[in-house]
Amino acid sequence: MHYFDIYDENFSKYRNKNITILEIGVFKGGSLSMWQKYFGPKVKIIGIDINEYCKRFEQENIKIYIGDQSNINFLDNVLADIDKPDIIIDDGGHSSNQQITSFNYLYEHLNYGGTYLVEDTHTSYASSKKFHDRLDKLTFVEYAKVLSDELNDWYRINSYKIYREPVNKANVSYWAKNIYKISFYNSIIAFEKRKNTIPFATIS
């Protein structure tokens, strides 16, 4: 499946709506123009890049911040200055530490009903050491697999106890309560954020 097909599958519901996109990795600005055309005139686009050159792509509805996506203080300053994002796209440095650090911090600030999409996850399998910069050697693909287990955290504890407790008191992880769906594609992983309710089974 081509990247554009994946974009449309995950983003079509946001077209022509008042939304904010946060894209990590501006490069030569091509994707910024693409998002303007795809989402329509109501979209606000926020770009993050480590290269000062990218500032030249700012326009009326496009703002660029220069900094390191794995720097929490930098990300915090960006978030304080923008509307809460509905879509976050990580097409940045592609190292495991950058992808995991950005995801862990930014996902919490994503609007409910929003989508977090990480591109070029094939770097998890690359031989180059520059992509494998974590002491624990964890790649983003492996981390996403862990999160797929977290998605089912409801079933790790006594199910009868879960069904008797309010969702906000259930002893399950943040990810179980806030990831509705994880979609694995060729070199892309997408997460949909929703407030999850306690799962139940109907016996017929």
Q: What are the functions of these language-model segments?
A:
Residues 1-89, 93-118, 122-204:
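A short alpha-helical cap/connector motif
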